[in-house]
């Protein structure tokens, strides 16, 4: 069920980009990349502030995660809070970029026609959607609760989004896991 929902969200992302056109979608991709860079600058300090605001489920005896090694189990709260901080900064900066994109969309411009441009725009939009889904699913994967871990582990699409996206998987693990807990 989760796999179907994730595939529908990705298909919706493709459709939205297909309808927008390539120029606007390139702008949104640049906005997402800028948001990711900005979030990478501020997420640590912000993540530390969430310890008092958001509860984190402590691991129970015999409970673990499918996506992280067991020796990191008692340090995953740092990854969880850093991920929340990163996602928050990313969301704020990207929302500003989207607002500016709406204004950009109102300017008269020549729309690049043709299926190739539309399909390219759809793929770019799907990549941005995939990155946002990957951030959210990776944050969920840090929570050591069976009610969260089991559905994620059983979903083929969720597992691949968390573990197998070529560039962003290693990058997110580098900034969220390796930089924080080693």
Task: Report the location of each language-model feature.
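Alpha-helical transmembrane segments and their juxtamembrane interface "caps"
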Residues: 1-182
């Amino acid at each position: 069920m989760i796999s179907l929902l994730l595939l529908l969200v990705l298909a919706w992302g493709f459709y939205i980009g297909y309808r927008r056109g390539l120029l606007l979608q390139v702008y949104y991709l640049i906005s997402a990349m800028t948001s990711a860079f900005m979030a990478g600058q501020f997420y640590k300090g912000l993540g530390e502030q969430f310890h008092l605001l958001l509860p984190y489920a402590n691991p129970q005896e015999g409970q673990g995660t499918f996506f992280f090694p067991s020796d990191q189990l008692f340090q995953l709260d740092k990854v969880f809070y850093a991920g929340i901080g990163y996602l928050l900064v990313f969301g704020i900066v990207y929302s500003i970029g989207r607002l500016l994109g709406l204004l950009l969309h109102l300017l008269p411009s020549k729309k690049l026609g043709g299926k190739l441009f539309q399909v390219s725009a759809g793929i770019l939009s799907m990549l941005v959607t995939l990155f946002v889904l990957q951030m959210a699913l990776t944050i969920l994967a840090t929570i050591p609760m069976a009610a969260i871990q089991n559905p994620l582990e059983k979903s083929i699409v969720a597992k691949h989004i968390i573990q197998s996206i070529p560039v962003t998987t290693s990058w997110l693990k580098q900034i969220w896991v390796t930089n924080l807990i080693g």
